[in-house]
Amino acid sequence: MDKEKKLLSRKLAKVRGWIQAVATLLTNIHIPNLFKGKIYQGNAKTVCVPGLNCYSCPAATGACPIGAFQAVVGSSRFKFSYYITGFFILLGVTLGRFICGFLCPFGWFQDLLHKIPGKKLSTAKLKPLRYLKYVILIVFVILLPMLVTNSIGMGDPFFCKYICPQGVLEGAIPLSIGNAAIRSALGKLFSFKCMILIAVIVLSILFYRPFCKWICPLGAIYSLFNKVSLLKITVDSSKCVGCGQCSKACKMDVDVCKTPDHPECIRCGACIKACPKDAICYRFMGKSCQKNDNR
């Protein structure tokens, strides 16, 4: 076992919260805009950020990849976007759902909510709901923006408009506080989206990351690359004693020993910290935490 790699893996897992905080700050660097009710519209807004972060957030540094993708497929001049597709492939192949675990602002928001003291419920018996996010990806992110269009052939960003709670949290609420015109224009759709946000908040206190597990289309996209991503979690079979502590620690309901590269794994490192034999670590570009592993 490579002790240095194991030590680095444990350190990375331990400082995950700080990395999430820094990632959220960098993703929303224009903080003064929160008090002005204005959206930053500089050149950086043409670049997508890796996690789910609303374009309409006054502090947002860049564009939301899901919002950008819907803008492309819903355009009357729709054509295959090499930029957006390449963005998903590059990040997916490189990091997979590590982005969900370390770099996504809304993922961190759910983590903080789940730390609120109180009774916590398991999602182990709700595994079929995992597939809902793929349905949402196909229907609300791809098909509806393409097929349901207005008189000039433009489709709505259906996921952003009707489902995404991050848009309300980061966009509508801050903008309405700082902008009287926007505040006066709020209607039933805003109320409906607020109900979704409240539901996600309550569920996040009870369950671990319900939005990530069941709803998020961005997580659905990144999950498709988990088995082939360069960054993975690997188990040293020569050290593993089958105690099951890693799977008990996994809040994403993954059997770590059997499927460490499962689509639901967000690379949070909980299993690394829980392993009493230091048999689990991060692996990048095929370099395993097992000395004699030549994969």
Put a short name on every predicted segment.
Residues 1-257, 263-295:
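Non-ligating segments of multi-cofactor redox enzymes
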